[in-house]
UniProtKB/Swiss-Prot annotation:
Subcellular location: Cell membrane
Membrane topology value: Multi-pass membrane protein
Keywords: ATP-binding, Cell membrane, Membrane, Nucleotide-binding, Transmembrane, Transmembrane helix, Transport
Transmembrane portions of the chain: 25-45, 61-81, 93-113, 148-168, 183-203, 223-243, 286-306, 327-347, 356-376, 380-400, 468-488
UniProt-listed InterPro entries: ADP_ATP_car_bac_type
PANTHER family noted in UniProt: ADP,ATP CARRIER PROTEIN 1 (PTHR31187:SF1), PTHR31187
Family: Belongs to the ADP/ATP translocase tlc family.
GO molecular function, one term: ATP binding
Principal location class: membrane
Protein name in UniProt: ADP,ATP carrier protein 5
GO cellular component annotations of the record: plasma membrane
Function description: Provides the rickettsial cell with host ATP in exchange for rickettsial ADP. This is an obligate exchange system. This energy acquiring activity is an important component of rickettsial parasitism.
Gene field: tlcE
Length: 499
């Protein structure tokens, strides 16, 4: 009786905390490692792109870059990718895209950035033109600082291409719906633990007492930070390619891990490009998915834009900005891991809607609190006079950091894993080209729409700042979050029909 009770407890414990069978480790371990490496690079690039662009130019320029550079690049990529999957294997697509991105990052790091005065317009000339044409000053800055803008744009595309699209397409092809319920939250748990490693690593590399000083002399700390970080990114990218090769040759060919191994992976004739997009456009399911993904990008970018402007005021140099950003990434990793464990059990005990709606609700509540602090900062400080032991600027940065940690924590743990489950019941065309269109375009449409709102205001009112336009952004933010919650409810109804 005791033995039966003990066995029952063991089974329940395993189901809750380690629902992976021993024979599945050959599939689970390489996929978890691949996710870890992709997210490692993603977060190193995230720290670098913001630290470089915002410290070297300004926080306001980011919105313009997202609208006029990142979004067109994302749209172009979707068209190229839709063509590539008709002629190339997933493995080759992954190699070619990795080679392209890493080649530019290396070129920027070792050639363009150290000699930026050669490649960019002289700062004095740029300032003169911006002063002469104040309504177009941000567009002039985009062109004059093209090196920073291209680097920022490609680093912005990395997560949507390598993580959201390629990794999850790989995982969805390899994983059954039943396995997804057990694997996906653990993928998130192990993969997002990379944020903690990135946080500690980048805090050290960007600090004054960096370990780099023990191995080499440093003439320019910001150049050294970017060069060492990019070298690490290139090495990890090579490891990603080796993992994709291993999985393709050893997992996809094993009937134990992949049900289609005996008959081979799907080679059915695919639709042409125009027909494919027409097919996707008719899918209400994908349109709802697009709204959800775009809403997150739109909402979080409104909050982040104001927050990052405050960070630059507090940490004006590339290295100090990167050091703070690294601390934020570290705590985001901790939040994601905690929320992944919570989300895993929520997904088991409740339906898909309950798990999926957590993210927009938390983001809306914390975002509104942040905007209230920015808009009514003086009233709040006078109300709690003497009780707050930090400056208004430091308080705004701290509250914004907490908001972003909670928002990203729920999004990257609970929302991402629940969203990927929506693709599993779809047919092959919607799983590949449909996913590419939704995953790459939607996030960028969300961010660029947010950036468009900001860019219109800054173009019409050249003297505007993020602090001044915060009341407008707060209203828009609330509306977008409510639309996201509505779309989650509608897509749950559609999912129930086909799951």
């Amino acid at each position: 009786m005791l033995s039966t009770s003990s066995r029952s407890f063991k089974n329940k414990f395993r189901a809750a905390f380690w629902p992976v069978h021993n024979y599945e480790l050959g599939k689970f371990i390489p996929m978890s490692t691949l996710m870890f490496c992709i997210l490692f690079n993603q977060n190193v690039l995230r720290i670098l792109k913001d630290s470089i662009l915002i410290s070297e130019i300004s926080a306001e320029i980011a919105g313009f870059a997202k609208v006029y550079c990142v979004t067109p690049a994302a749209a172009l990529f979707v068209i190229i990718y839709a063509k590539m999957i008709n002629y190339l294997t997933f493995e080759k697509i992954f190699y070619y895209l990795s080679a392209f991105f890493i080649s530019f990052f290396v070129l920027f790091t070792f050639v363009i950035y150290p000699n930026i005065h050669i490649f960019h317009v002289h700062p004095n000339n740029l300032a003169d033109w911006m002063e002469r044409y104040p309504h177009f000053k941000w567009y002039i800055s985009l062109v004059g600082n093209w090196g920073y803008i291209v680097y920022y744009s490609l680093a912005e595309l990395w997560p949507n291409i390598f993580y959201v699209l390629l990794f999850w397409q790989f995982a969805n092809e390899l994983t059954t719906t039943e396995e997804a319920k057990r694997f996906y939250t653990l993928f998130s748990l192990f993969g997002n633990s990379s944020l903690i490693l990135v946080g500690f690593l980048m805090m050290n590399l960007s600090s004054e007492d960096t370990i780099i000083k023990k191995f080499m002399s440093i003439s320019d700390s910001k150049i050294t930070l970017v060069q060492v970080s990019t070298t690490i990114v290139a090495i990890v990218a090579i490891i990603c390619c080796l993992l994709v090769r291993f999985i393709s040759k050893n997992v996809f060919t094993n009937p134990l891990f992949y049900a289609k191994a005996k008959s081979g992976r799907s080679t059915s004739e695919r639709m042409g490009l125009i027909k494919s997009f027409k097919y996707i456009a008719k899918s209400k399911y994908l349109w709802l998915l697009l709204i959800c993904s775009a809403a997150f990008g739109f909402a979080i970018n409104l909050v982040e834009a104001v927050w990052k402007a405050k960070i630059k005021e507090l940490y004006p140099t590339v290295n100090t900005y990167a050091e703070f950003n690294s601390l934020y990434i570290l705590w985001t990793g901790v939040a994601i891991m905690v929320m992944t464990i919570i989300g895993n059990n929520i997904m088991r005990m409740h339906n898909w809607f309950v798990a999926a709606v957590i993210s927009p609700v938390i983001i809306m509540v914390t975002g509104i609190l942040f905007f209230v602090l920015i808009v009514f900062d003086q009233q709040i400080l006078s109300l709690f006079d003497g009780a707050i032991l930090m400056s208004p600027l430091a308080l705004a940065v701290s509250i914004g950091g907490i908001q972003n940690i909670l928002a990203k924590g729920t999004k990257y743990s609970i929302w991402d894993t629940s969203r990927e489950m929506l693709y599993i019941p779809l047919d092959e065309e919607l799983k590949t080209k449909g996913k590419a269109a939704v995953d790459v375009i939607s996030a960028k449409v969300g961010k660029s729409s947010s950036g468009l709102v900001q860019s219109i205001i800054f173009t019409l009112v050249p003297t505007a700042t993020f602090t001044l336009i915060s009341p407008i952004l707060m209203v828009v933010f609330t509306f977008v979050c409510l639309a996201w919650i509505y779309a989650v409810r509608k897509i749950y109804c559609e999912y129930q029909k086909i799951a």
